[in-house]
Amino acid sequence: MEIFELSGIAPNPKIESVREGVKLCKENSIDMVLAIGGGSVIDCAKVVAAGACYDGDPWDLVITPRWIKKALPIYSVLTLSATGSEMDKFAVISDMSKNEKWGTASDHMKPKMSILDPEYTYSV
């Protein structure tokens, strides 16, 4: 098994991070996405997973969710409990070049499995 990492996902994930993740998935024939972090990491992973199965710019999928026809399987390990992203089909992505922040949703972006160790949330 080969593992590829997309690190440095900031709060309010940016479309640039999504594009980088999609490129990583396509160039390396990645077949699943594991998000380890909080809601921003999981939101980014969801759109990366959908974008990896789409031929255009992943921003298209943010502003036009009906174009999401499939996504790579998504799994999450939640380290910060706050947004509910680990159990839903929604994601919020920002494009700072346009000063826009959009929500998108698709059943294809719902994580297949999520793990939560409550000890990670004691300090929240």
Where are these regions (language model features)?
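A glycine/threonine-rich phosphate-anchoring loop and its flanking beta-alpha core
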Residues: 53-124
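N-terminal small/polar loop signature for handling phosphorylated ligands or for N-terminal nucleophile
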Residues: 1-56, 65-66
